[in-house]
Amino acid sequence: MHWQTHTVFNQPIPLNNSNLYLSDGALCEAVTREGAGWDSDFLASIGQQLGTAESLELGRLANVNPPELLRYDAQGRRLDDVRFHPAWHLLMQALCTNRVHNLAWEEDARSGAFVARAARFMLHAQVEAGSLCPITMTFAATPLLLQMLPAPFQDWTTPLLSDRYDSHLLPGGQKRGLLIGMGMTEKQGGSDVMSNTTRAERLEDGSYRLVGHKWFFSVPQSDAHLVLAQTAGGLSCFFVPRFLPDGQRNAIRLERLKDKLGNRSNASCEVEFQDAIGWLLGQEGEGIRLILKMGGMTRFDCALGSHAMMRRAFSLAIYHAHQRHVFGNPLIQQPLMRHVLSRMALQLEGQTALLFRLARAWDRRADAKEALWARLFTPAAKFVICKRGMPFVAEAMEVLGGIGYCEESELLRLYREMPVNSIWEGSGNIMCLDVLRVLNKQAGVYDLLSEAFVEVKGQDRYFDRAVRRLQQQLRKPAEELGREITHQLFLLGCGAQMLKYASPPMAQAWCQVMLDTRGGVRLSEQIQNDLLLRATGGVCV
């Protein structure tokens, strides 16, 4: 475009027509390796659709037009509803059509469905992350509800397993698709849910009356929430629907929406239960056990979502560097910039390898070893990857310079979104304490680690040295070292996957960069070329 004073040139065009799946070599390989190659064609199809300018614009619109709380109608009657921009509904429709909320729970689900679903989740998260909150809670709650749906709600099974998104304000049994939320956090407790004060009193018909509050109650428009409340038998889990069996609204009062740093598209609410009615799931006192069943899956999604946003930030950075010229050459050809981008790509390689090994473990959790692998590495992955996200996106911003620091850039939304996954579903220290709990109390965990690490022993001296260092720490795993132990465990999990499946030069480069505490590692030109080719589908060299 020509202006009076100058001609605009050397300004890269936006990245808005790419295939989010085929451009990610590490992801394509991981999906096939971990048992979901049968979904590759579908992933390529939705990867192309999600990478369009139209899809990306929906993500922008949903965030610049946040949800609005509707407490009352014009006549003063309680509504307790939330109004969303149309872009939100289109994003949710796509997620449900692609079965990100229930793929693994279908009656005829194929082996590897958890892996395929993880890949679909990752692609959608690169477009808009807030809409993944209702999806991940629904995904985690569905298997529990398929076993424990209270008798008055047996007609919910079909819409729970449908591929439809239905935003109508109707009883769940009358809808084509359902969303399920969770209500745990209270003002005084946060992660300490045992201090919850919401009370539940058993009624004659077997239901319970709930009185109390929740301080962070995301997706208040859900058709039901799984809510923790105190009973005579201890902290318990309740199915609290939006509509009662007689068609009346339940007494769930929406007080205000949270004004959050990021996650702007998604509604998070403060609520009060004024004699709300709920149905007990399991037995009184089993609330923590039931919530933990779902918590592992939501924590995995937190790690996966942060990784996906890191991947999007990297894509924006390398695309910019490929087009932008400095000092007579493309930015991608400048040695220092090329090295920075290569190290970012290398970090993503290791994370992808571990996350999709984790997805396979979740897929095969009926096997005791796989279940233990998921139990140990899920909180470790959430702790490390969600922590890494913020500086990673900041690095991508630096690649773009000032244009990456302006509201027109996707990177600002990614940066604001990053902290939430470190906080939700248990903050960093909670994850590390959980890892220590598994290491101290789960039978067979040390045999599991030994088996995983012995399999690649002798292939890389940095890896072997790091294993010995972790073994020393685990002789007496002190709580104060929880973060260091968790971080080291995560790195070794990534390293084992890289040594097992990546090319030897790339695996050794990963181990040296990530495990050599001395630093100062220079990646060879060949490794840089390989990394950048894999990270762009062969576009940027």
Residue locations for each model-derived region?
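Flexible, small-/acidic-enriched active-site or ligand-binding loops
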Residues: Q248-Q274
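Alpha-helix capping/hinge segments and adjacent helical runs
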Residues: Q4-T5, Q11, S18, L22, ...
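A short core secondary-structure module
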Residues: S207, V211-A251
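A glycine-rich, basic-preceded beta-loop-alpha segment at the flavin cofactor/substrate interface
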Residues: D246-Q248, E270-T298, S315-I332, A466-E479
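Extended, charge-enriched "interface" segments that sit outside catalytic cores
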Residues: M1-R110, A129, C540-V541
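C-terminal helix-coil-helix/basic helical segment that borders enzyme active sites and/or dimer interfaces
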Residues: E349-K382, E398, Q471-G482, T486
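Internal helix-loop-helix
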Residues: D80-P171, S218-P220, W424
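C-terminal amphipathic alpha-helical interaction region
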Residues: E455-V541
